[in-house]
């Protein structure tokens, strides 16, 4: 991937009535995190607990701490395990322990430096420490940059399902340094591309077409810096617009769950960590695409376009061998169930989806049969 140089940061507002904030892309990146915190109104001199994992802390931890110190903050670094199988209340308790040792106060700050798992756990720890302190997201994976870090969803997994324990807790700032993708493993990059494709299907047909026109998508080295910036901007803008209009998933925000209903089943039944989150979402998008064809909501050509783009990104498209009745049982425990009815985000065309709560169990069985 080309070196990312962008002196002028791109600033995308998340226009919430009670606590608006910015998604900042580029600029000085992690070198400027201290300045960006001050711009966001976080007081100089406060204690800051930076939470990261070893793979991220090694190349970027000192850089982040130095920037915070230079701007007058008092940072401490906590390094945790960050696999999906570590996304548990026990791991959050470790963050709470570090917050206690650092004597964090209500005016203090937690900073998530890492991917989606670090962001989810740190956000939840901040939401529950002293009944809620501020959090800043510094995403270092593509998936976190375009999705997980934006919007305030935090939480951990339960043996019965993904993200069943959590809270809405909006960050004070999201700072995206695209240069951190230079050290991201290719598999993680591909997983993030699933969420980018999702935005194309649910509301940005032009983004979908842009991705279709790129010869190869499955490694970061295949994207020029200006193209990567465009992908990050369009994805962050898509997420921020939805969150700004529906912060707590009362309506429109549910479209962001496209591919996630089936995807969470795959993660739960295959075991957390077997698939990366983005990989499971990719499988889920193919599955719900098949469901949409069976319901005659969209045509086979569009379903095939989606499937081809997902495959081009190096993502899995095959449904795993799972007992259909176990799938149905797990779906019933999904947090998106409403009034006992299964809710799915169903595509009606590239760039358009509908939220449906009338999907029958027999339709799901038929869909799973077609996928097998």
From Swiss-Prot:
UniProt-annotated location(s): Cytoplasm
UniProt keyword annotations, A-Z: Amino-acid biosynthesis, Aromatic amino acid biosynthesis, Cobalt, Cytoplasm, Lyase, Metal-binding, NAD, Nucleotide-binding, Zinc
Enzyme class: lyase
Cofactor note: Binds 1 divalent metal cation per subunit. Can use either Co(2+) or Zn(2+).
Positions bound to Zn(2+): 195, 260, 277
Binding site for NAD(+): 116-120, 140-141, 153, 162, 180-183
Keyword Transcription: no
Cofactor entry: Co(2+); Zn(2+); NAD(+)
Pathway stated in the Swiss-Prot or TrEMBL entry: Metabolic intermediate biosynthesis; chorismate biosynthesis; chorismate from D-erythrose 4-phosphate and phosphoenolpyruvate: step 2/7
Cross-referenced InterPro entries: Dehydroquinate_synthase, DHQ_synth_AroB, DHQ_synth_fam, DHQS/DOIS_N, DHQS_C
GO CC annotation terms, alphabetical: cytoplasm
Entry similarity comment: Belongs to the sugar phosphate cyclases superfamily. Dehydroquinate synthase family.
HAMAP family, per database record: DHQ_synthase (MF_00110)
NCBIfam families: aroB
Name recorded for this polypeptide: 3-dehydroquinate synthase
Species name: Prochlorococcus marinus (strain MIT 9303)
């Amino acid at each position: 991937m080309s070196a990312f140089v962008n002196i002028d940061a791109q600033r995308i507002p998340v226009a919430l009535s009670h606590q608006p904030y910015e998604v900042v892309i580029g600029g000085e990146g992690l070198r400027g995190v201290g300045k960006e915190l001050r711009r966001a109104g976080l007081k100089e001199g406060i204690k800051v607990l930076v939470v990261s994992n070893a793979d991220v802390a090694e190349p970027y931890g000192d850089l982040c701490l130095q920037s915070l110190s230079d701007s007058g903050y008092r940072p401490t670094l906590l390094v945790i395990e960050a696999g999906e199988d570590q996304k548990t209340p026990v791991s959050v308790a470790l963050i709470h322990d570090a917050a206690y040792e650092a004597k964090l106060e209500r005016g203090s700050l937690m900073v998530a430096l890492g991917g989606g798992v670090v962001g989810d756990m740190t956000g939840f720890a901040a939401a529950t420490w002293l009944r809620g302190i501020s959090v800043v997201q510094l995403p270092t994976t593509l998936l976190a940059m375009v999705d997980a870090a934006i919007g305030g969803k935090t939480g951990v997994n339960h043996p019965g399902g993904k993200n069943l324990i959590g809270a809405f807790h909006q960050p004070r700032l999201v700072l995206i340094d695209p240069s951190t993708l230079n050290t991201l493993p290719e598999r993680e990059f591909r997983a993030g591309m699933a969420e980018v494709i999702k935005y194309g299907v649910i509301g940005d047909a032009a983004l979908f077409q842009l991705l279709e026109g790129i010869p190869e998508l499955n490694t970061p080295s295949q994207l020029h810096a200006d193209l990567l910036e465009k992908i990050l901007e369009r994805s962050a803008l898509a997420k921020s617009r939805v969150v700004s209009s529906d912060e707590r998933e009362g309506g429109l925000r549910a479209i962001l769950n496209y591919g996630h209903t089936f995807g969470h089943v795959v993660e739960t039944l295959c075991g957390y960590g077997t698939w990366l989150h983005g990989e499971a979402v990719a499988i889920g998008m193919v599955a719900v695409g098949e469901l949409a064809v069976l319901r005659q909501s969209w045509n086979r050509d569009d379903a095939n376009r989606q499937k081809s783009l997902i495959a081009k990104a190096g993502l899995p498209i095959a449904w795993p061998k799972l007992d259909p009745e176990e799938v149905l049982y797990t779906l019933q425990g999904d947090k998106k169930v409403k009034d006992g009815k299964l809710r799915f985000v169903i595509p009606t065309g590239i760039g358009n989806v509908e939220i449906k709560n009338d999907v029958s169990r027999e339709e799901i069985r038929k869909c799973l049969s077609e996928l097998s």
